[in-house]
A protein has these predicted regions:
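N-terminal Rossmann-like NAD(P)+-binding domain of SDR-like oxidoreductases, especially those catalyzing
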Residues: 1-162
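C-terminal substrate-binding subdomain of Rossmann-fold SDR/epimerase-dehydratase oxidoreductases
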Residues: 2-10, 14, 181-302
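Residue-level signature of the cytosolic catalytic core of signaling kinases
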Residues: 30, 43, 166-170, 232, ...
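Residues in well-ordered alpha-helical elements
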Residues: 45, 57, 69, 76, ...
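The catalytic Tyr-centered alpha-helix of NAD(P)H-dependent dehydrogenases
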Residues: 78, 128-135, 170-174, 198-202
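Proline-centered turn/helix-capping motifs that create local helix->coil transitions or kinks
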Residues: 98, 104, 114-116, 151, ...
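A glycine/serine/threonine-rich, flexible loop-to-helix segment
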Residues: 118, 169-176, 243
């Protein structure tokens, strides 16, 4: 996201909690091309000062604790980051509406919880039960409340599983499988491999967020939530197979642990609303996205 905004010659202010030397942000030298503010979403005075001093016009709320396993082990810190962080930021935006003209909030397909009908549409209830899922349901509802009550110009994005360059969480299935395959090691599948998700290339997600932000002056768009998906759901074993082929290691077999808990078995999205209202569709898709992703990890891992 930051790289694309810089390429568009935007003036970008980044709130950075942790400096990671191998991060995509650092490797691209984006610290020198943006204004970096060190801090966290839990620090409300910092957020208000940041928005005020830099006269921020568009807010992309992407910060969160995003790891399901971490949320199960540490629900309090997850809710502090994801729930408190969201209402802190939206309150700061409310108090700076003189300059803040649009806010895009990243929710998740997990906000829906376990729904009886697939694919999920935007009018499905938000029923997250497990800690991470619940945090995203809250993020979603708080954002809608700030729009309905205070007319803070908010839109909400709900994506499936994002993948692409820059993800250094090796517990996620795509980066973990790529690293294992590059090392010629069996990839680890923590579930039984049958869990179904949709996978969205990060470049398609960035395009979706920016397209949404650009169209928020339309009354039929502002205040709305949008699903973004390539609408090609895959089981875990299917996505592992796709990754292994992309790395050119089709004969490697995954080590299936069957140890997943507090996870929904099948979860994927309809992007019909985004197609019809925004004219959005994925440019890269799974195959091209994986090819670009594998190339990035090969360079990273040597």
């Amino acid at each position: 996201m930051v790289a694309e905004l810089v390429a568009r010659r935007a003036s970008v202010v980044c709130l950075v909690r942790d400096q990671v030397s191998q991060s995509h942000f650092s490797r691209l030298g984006l610290e020198q091309k943006t204004v970096v503010v060190n801090g966290c979403l839990e620090d409300y005075p910092l957020l208000e000062r940041l928005l005020n001093e830099h006269e921020v016009e568009t807010v992309m709320h992407l910060g969160a604790q995003t790891i399901v396993g971490t949320a199960n082990r540490n629900p309090l810190s997850t809710w502090e980051s994801n729930v408190r962080g969201t209402y802190n930021l939206l309150e700061a935006c409310r108090r700076n509406q003189r300059t803040v003209g649009r806010v895009v909030v990243a929710s998740s397909d997990k906000a829906y919880g376990d729904q009886p009908e697939l694919p999920y549409h935007e009018d499905a209830p938000l029923e997250g039960r497990f800690p991470y899922d619940c945090s995203k349901s809250c993020t979603d509802l708080i954002s809608r409340s700030y729009y309905e009550t205070f007319k803070v110009p908010v839109c909400i994005t709900r994506c499936g599983n994002l993948f692409g360059p820059g993800d250094l969480n090796w517990n996620r299935i795509v980066p973990g499988t790529i690293r294992s395959a590059i090392r010629n090691e069996p990839p680890i599948v923590r579930s039984d491999g049958s869990f179904v998700r949709d996978y969205v290339y990060v470049g398609d997600a960035v395009a979706a967020y920016l397209e949404l932000a650009e169209q928020m002056d339309r009354p039929e768009v502002v205040g709305q939530a949008f699903n973004f998906s390539d609408e090609r759901p895959q089981s875990v074993l299917e996505i592992v197979d796709c990754v292994l082929k992309a790395v050119d290691c089709p004969d490697l077999k995954p080590n299936v642990l069957n140890q997943a808990s507090h996870e929904i078995r099948a979860q994927y999205l309809s992007a019909e609303k985004a197609r019809e209202l925004l004219g959005w569709s994925p440019r890269y898709g799974l195959t091209q996205g994986l090819a670009l992703t594998v190339a990035w990890y090969r360079e990273l891992l040597g």
